């Protein structure tokens, strides 16, 4: 990629971009990271938004690959694209891929996607981001699969890591915890217990604290011993 500024736009598009499209799908993490770290070199020669749009078929191909390890490689590329791409292009073309990964059949991908979503929120926070994410979470919270409902809670836990920025969690995400704390599956209620207990300690919002304490009282009376342990131990 370092030769792109030297050979110019036409030759970069003819020779460099086809190689990039192939190598970005390589299974070797180091190869992909070298490409991503040198994207700025391409930006000196071609319009980066046009480049990202041209990359979408490759990104789609990776995200739909039958091999879950291949699908799991896409995070670092998405994070970089979020940093360098026009916001509108990202939300229209790449955000749907990020959202879809939250319901991937493989746990490792769902878990990694939860962490990625928090990184993306820190970079792109705004009403458009919150609306897209919450629309997906509403659907996931109603899923017949408890694993998908559990993923909602695991994602929300990522937003508890930043103890000094709880506004989005309290206003938009906490209602999901209130609902799922009554889930029929103990594992879901157990993870909700962790969130409720920690948020009760961290929040400065009186209404949120009151709701947390009400949920704590309910969860302490849960029929499952692991749920009771989670709400009393955290």
Show the residue positions of the predicted features.
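HEAT/HEAT-like alpha-solenoid repeats
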Residues: 10-24, 49-63, 88-102, 127-141, ...
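Eukaryotic tandem repeat interaction scaffolds
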Residues: 108-109, 118-170, 174
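Eukaryotic acidic, Ser/Thr-rich intrinsically disordered low-complexity regions
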Residues: 212-234
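HEAT-repeat alpha-solenoid elements in large eukaryotic scaffold proteins
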Residues: 1, 29-39, 68-78, 107-116, ...
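Alpha-solenoid HEAT/ARM repeat scaffold
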Residues: 14, 33, 53, 72, ...
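Alpha-helix N-cap/helix-start positions at coil->helix boundaries
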Residues: 25, 29-30, 64, 68-69, ...
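Hydrophobic residues within the alpha-helices of tandem HEAT/HEAT-like
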Residues: 1-6, 23-24, 38-46, 62-63, ...
């Amino acid at each position: 990629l370092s030769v792109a500024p030297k050979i110019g736009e036409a030759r970069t598009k003819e020779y460099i971009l086809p190689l990039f499209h192939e190598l970005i799908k390589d299974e070797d993490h180091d190869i992909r990271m070298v490409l991503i770290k040198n994207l700025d070199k391409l930006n000196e020669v071609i319009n980066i938004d046009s480049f990202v749009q041209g990359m979408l078929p490759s990104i789609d191909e990776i995200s739909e690959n039958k091999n879950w390890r291949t699908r799991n490689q896409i995070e670092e590329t998405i994070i970089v694209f979020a940093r360098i791409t026009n916001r509108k292009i990202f939300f229209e073309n790449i955000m749907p891929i990020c959202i879809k990964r939250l319901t991937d059949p493989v746990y490792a991908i769902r878990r990694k996607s939860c962490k990625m979503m928090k990184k993306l929120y820190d970079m792109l926070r705004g009403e458009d981001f919150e609306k897209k994410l919450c629309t997906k979470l509403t659907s996931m919270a109603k899923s017949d699969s408890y694993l998908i409902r559990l993923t909602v809670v695991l994602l929300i836990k990522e937003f508890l890591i930043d103890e000094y920025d709880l506004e989005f969690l309290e206003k938009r995400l906490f209602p999901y915890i209130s609902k799922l704390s009554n889930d029929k599956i103990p594992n879901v209620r157990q993870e909700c217990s962790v969130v409720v207990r920690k948020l009760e300690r961290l929040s400065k919002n009186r209404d949120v604290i009151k709701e947390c304490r009400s949920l704590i009282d309910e969860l302490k009376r849960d029929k499952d011993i692991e749920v009771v342990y989670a709400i009393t131990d955290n």
